[in-house]
């Protein structure tokens, strides 16, 4: 690349995590200096270390601070990544006003496409098909509800000012409209600072297919084929691929030409993505949804099938260079699939998780790419989007790519933070996914099936108990010093109470030593260590000789340390686990699955009731208390909303588990809470 690409030879990346590192990689390859910005929460983050230099800012949304950082470091250009300020027209103008090159489209194009109402009107005038709906600005709640009924249910409520699924609501019943509108406005305001909504007809069996476009400042524009993005949860993509298994070449070219027309309609320059909704039943019919005026999260799949570096193209176009190829030069080769690794728990409604990365092993190999912002020690909190990394593969055909991605995810181990990796593997193996029969509702319809493996296997409980035995073994020949339940004249057992994350305590009894034991995975326990059936004691205590847990069958097992992990033989089968410990919690990982297992600590007061299923309300995720809807002493009904918890701009309403009176309310709005923190205690009324 010539020196004119950036006169200062330095680019500031106004972002964090994996996308910042991704941009740094291309800058480094081109010999261009890189500048990172970071907040206090990210002071030790990997993207800070990977840049040539870094500077602190109070917020990634602080335009003045970002401009000031660029000036202070001598950067001549700013790459916004995606999210944060990437689609902020005021930021693009501020860069231009400061003499900085904004590596993105003109502010006028951002404004035209950033407002969904204006965008639909603009592209419709250019002949691009749009979904039937109402897109006037300033519609009141009543007008929105009336518009929804006019368009015809089901409808989608969508924020005008932003995308990514935030603030989007599917409404199928007129009675749900008031609550859906209020919730969508609240989330849109929190995410984009604008609660304007539009309403569109919901296309049945919809597929989400998008076209990558590129335009230069010389009037040239091309498309780089499509990406299939139909596999989503909560309107957010989790697996993307290129090309789409639905489209034939003729439809691909029609959609591509339509996307180029949309870009030209707003004088677009740079990388952009035109998103379409396509009926799986009628693939030749497609409708414009929106245009993202930035690099997309899923851009790597396009890179792998075209052989192009899209960040390099962004840099060249921003420097005023013409596109180095024409539409006829664009050829798609093979197939690429990407899976997004999120800090979330699919079995609990995809609620965000968090924590510190204790151990990390990311996949590698031929045609396997990982875009990641993680490192061992990284703190994953609730301040930012829960996406941690992307695993991207290429194959000669779709079947090969799917197999390669499944194998890659099987070798992905992250301990310390719960992720969706095992869920992604289950999704890739779904018969409809393998056959290419995709639509945006597939994940929701198949959720029970896809999370069926979420239950902790008995052998994992066994490994956790034996790991504690192994840690306590001293090598002392005195039988009294060995934690194997030994007593003169009779065999005994050592019971451990192990609690999986988000689950109930389970008793695991061990007779023998870690290398040669008989293990029984038994009944669920109450929080104070009592078993309703036999009243046995708490973790680590000695129980009566010969007593077995009613729910379990004794199994021969042995455990030994093996490098950074453990090797367990259980019932004649041997498996290796990656292991890491944090306090009383042991993390185990294998085949993309991870388990957090906490050795029981006797609970106090009302906390014990939570496990017993009484009136204790616990936080389903780490986050911030957004609203408390009751006060101590209030009478509440079962299922009544009591507390709203927010994490990563997602709200979750926690309801009363029983009817009764609010006895304790230890939290208030604005409080930070951990996973399973007590939010309220409800006492059932007597009689």
Per-range role (PLM):
Residues 9, 166, 243, 385-391, ...:
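Short amphipathic alpha-helical segments
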Residues 198, 578, 596-598, 624, ...:
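Residues located in well-ordered beta-strands
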Residues 606-687:
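Structured functional modules or segments
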Residues 574, 578-619:
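Catalytic P-loop NTP-binding/switch module of NTPases
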Residues 259, 300-303, 308-550, 641, ...:
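Catalytic cores of soluble metabolic enzymes centered on carboxylation/carboxyl-transfer
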Residues 173, 215-220, 278-283, 364, ...:
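Short acidic-glycine loop/turn motifs at beta-strand connectors
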Residues 1-274, 278-299:
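N-terminal beta-alpha lobe that positions the nucleotide/phosphoryl donor
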């Amino acid at each position: 690349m010539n020196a004119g690409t950036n006169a200062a030879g330095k680019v500031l990346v106004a972002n964090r995590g994996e996308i910042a590192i991704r941009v740094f990689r291309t800058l480094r390859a081109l010999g261009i200096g890189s500048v990172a910005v970071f907040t206090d929460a990210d002071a030790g983050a990997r993207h800070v270390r990977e840049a040539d230099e870094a500077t602190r800012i109070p917020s990634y949304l602080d335009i003045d601070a970002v401009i000031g950082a660029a000036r202070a470091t001598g950067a001549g250009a700013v790459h916004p990544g995606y999210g944060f300020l990437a689609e902020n027209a005021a930021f693009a103008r501020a860069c231009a006003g400061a003499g900085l090159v904004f590596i993105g489209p003109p502010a006028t194009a951002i404004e035209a496409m950033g407002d969904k109402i204006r965008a639909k009107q603009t592209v419709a005038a250019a002949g691009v098909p749009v979904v039937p709906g109402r897109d006037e600005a300033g519609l009141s709640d009543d007008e929105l509800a009336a518009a929804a009924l006019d368009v015809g249910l089901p409808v989608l409520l969508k924020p005008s000012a932003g995308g990514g699924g935030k603030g989007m609501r599917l409404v199928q019943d007129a009675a749900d409209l008031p609550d859906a509108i209020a919730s969508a406005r609240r989330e849109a305001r929190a995410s984009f600072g604008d609660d304007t909504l539009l309403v569109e007809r919901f296309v049945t069996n919809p597929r989400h297919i998008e076209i990558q476009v590129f335009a230069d400042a010389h009037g040239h524009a091309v498309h780089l084929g499509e990406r299939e993005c139909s596999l989503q949860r909560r309107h957010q993509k989790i697996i993307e691929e290129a090309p789409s298994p639905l489209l034939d070449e003729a439809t691909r070219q029609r959609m591509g030409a339509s996307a180029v027309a949309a870009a030209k309609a707003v004088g677009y320059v740079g990388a952009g993505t035109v998103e379409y909704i396509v009926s799986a039943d009628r693939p030749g019919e497609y409708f414009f949804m929106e245009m993202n005026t930035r690099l997309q999260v899923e851009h790597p799949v396009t890179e792998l099938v075209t052989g192009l570096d899209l960040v390099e193209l962004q840099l060249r176009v921003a420097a005023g260079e013409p596109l180095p190829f024409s539409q006829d030069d664009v050829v798609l080769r093979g197939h690429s699939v990407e899976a997004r690794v999120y800090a979330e728990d699919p079995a609990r409604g995809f609620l965000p998780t968090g924590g510190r990365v204790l151990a990390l092993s990311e996949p590698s190999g031929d045609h396997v790419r990982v875009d990641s912002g993680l490192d061992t020690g990284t703190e994953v909190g609730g301040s930012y989007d829960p996406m941690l990394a992307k695993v991207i593969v290429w194959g000669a055909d779709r079947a090969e790519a799917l197999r390669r991605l499944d194998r890659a995810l099987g070798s992905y181990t992250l301990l310390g933070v719960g992720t969706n990796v095992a869920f992604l593997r289950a999704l890739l193996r779904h018969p409809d996914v393998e056959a290419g029969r995709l639509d945006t509702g597939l994940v929701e319809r198949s959720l029970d099936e896809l999370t069926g493996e979420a239950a902790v296997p008995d052998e994992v409980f066994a490994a956790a108990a034996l790991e504690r035995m192994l840690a306590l073994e001293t090598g002392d020949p005195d039988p009294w010093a060995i934690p194997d339940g030994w007593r003169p004249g009779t065999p005994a057992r050592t019971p451990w109470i192990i609690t999986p994350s988000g689950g109930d305590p389970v008793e695991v009894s061990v007779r023998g030593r870690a290398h040669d034991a008989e293990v029984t995975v038994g009944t669920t326990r109450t929080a104070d260590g009592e078993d309703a059936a036999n009243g046995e004691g708490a973790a680590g205590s000695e129980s009566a000789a010969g007593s077995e847990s009613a729910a379990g069958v004794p199994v021969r097992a042995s455990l030994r340390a093996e490098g950074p992990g453990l090797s367990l033989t259980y019932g004649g089968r041997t498996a290796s686990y990656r292991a890491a410990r944090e306090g009383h919690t042991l993390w185990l990982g294998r085949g993309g699955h991870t388990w957090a297992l906490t050795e029981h600590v006797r609970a106090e007061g009302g906390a014990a009731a939570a496990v017993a299923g009484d009136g204790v309300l616990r936080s389903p995720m780490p986050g911030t208390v957004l609203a408390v809807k009751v006060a101590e002493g209030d009478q509440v009904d079962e299922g009544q909303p009591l507390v709203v918890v927010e994490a990563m701009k997602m709200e979750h309403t926690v309801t009363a588990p029983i009817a009764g009176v609010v006895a304790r309310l230890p939290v208030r709005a604005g409080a930070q809470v951990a996973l399973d923190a007590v939010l309220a205690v409800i006492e059932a009324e007597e009689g």
